[in-house]
């Protein structure tokens, strides 16, 4: 039978085998698979892959990079990152240790978000062309469509998480979104919560975890950042999950439109 898992599914299976299923081992296995020097562009942040010689200067550099990220409503994420770091001084003192788990410059997350969130707001999140039959337009304004789907109806949505990352963005969305950028975000996502992605009982409700991130009502989104127990690591992980899922969702939204357009053209030709 043909393997339908796709590149991400195959990667997860390989990592699960190498790590023996334990989340700590999985994280270590993922980190070990990443190149030491990484395919970073010339303008990659200076704090990437460098020892924490000066905790304060590293924190300042990280703050500057995080300044470009925003909440679903457009508000800055940085205050919530700072609050998380304040409550967890150990992670704030050695930010490079936390960042080392996520081999993707935070500017990459901002690039992905800026390129995808607007289109998704119109289509996928607002009950557009990918809406499940019988659920189009039934969600309150500002809430993600998936919040109203049953668990069974959410299963097809999980398919959007198993695509090849570069395919999520056609060339027309900007040359700055290079494959190395998207692959870095993929790595960050896998580091963030491998136990969620690898367990059957949790991956089925993965979209439930993402609902606050996709909601325009940012109260729950802010609460999520304030309640993180592991500081900067979890905060960056949540951001990685948000933007990678945006990328994959956009990919499926565009594919849906392209398929519909192809069918329409074929019908016109046949008639």
Curated annotation (Swiss-Prot):
GO terms for molecular function: STAT family protein binding. One of its GO terms (cellular component) is nucleus. GO terms for biological process: negative regulation of transcription by RNA polymerase II. InterPro entries: FAM220A, SIPAR. It holds the Pfam family FAM220. PANTHER family: PROTEIN FAM220A, PROTEIN FAM220BP-RELATED. This is Putative protein FAM220BP. It comes from Homo sapiens (Human).
């Amino acid at each position: 039978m043909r393997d339908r898992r796709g590149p991400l599914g195959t990667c997860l299976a390989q990592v699960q085998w190498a790590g023996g299923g334990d989340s700590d081992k999985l994280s270590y296995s993922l980190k070990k698979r990443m190149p030491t020097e990484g395919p970073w562009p010339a303008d990659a942040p200076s704090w990437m892959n460098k020892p924490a010689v000066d905790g304060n200067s590293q924190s300042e550099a990280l703050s500057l990079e995080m300044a470009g990220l925003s909440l679903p409503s457009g508000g800055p994420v940085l205050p919530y990152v700072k609050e998380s770091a304040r409550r967890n001084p150990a992670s704030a003192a050695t930010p490079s240790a936390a960042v080392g788990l996520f081999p993707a410059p935070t500017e990459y997350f901002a690039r992905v978000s800026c390129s995808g969130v607007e289109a998704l707001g119109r289509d996928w999140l607002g009950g557009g062309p990918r809406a499940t039959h019988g659920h189009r337009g039934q969600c309150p304004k500002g809430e993600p469509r998936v919040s109203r789907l049953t668990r069974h109806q959410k299963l097809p949505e999980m398919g959007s998480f198993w695509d090849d990352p570069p395919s999520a963005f056609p060339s027309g969305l900007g040359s700055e979104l290079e494959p190395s950028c998207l692959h870095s975000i993929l790595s960050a996502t896998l580091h963030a919560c491998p136990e969620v992605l690898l367990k059957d009982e949790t991956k089925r409700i993965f979209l439930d975890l993402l609902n606050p991130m996709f909601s325009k009502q940012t109260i729950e989104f802010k609460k999520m950042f304030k309640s993180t127990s592991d500081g900067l690591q979890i905060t960056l992980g949540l951001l990685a999950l948000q933007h990678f899922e945006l990328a994959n969702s956009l990919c499926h939204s565009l594919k849906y439109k392209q398929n519909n357009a192809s069918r329409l053209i074929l019908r016109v030709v046949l008639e």
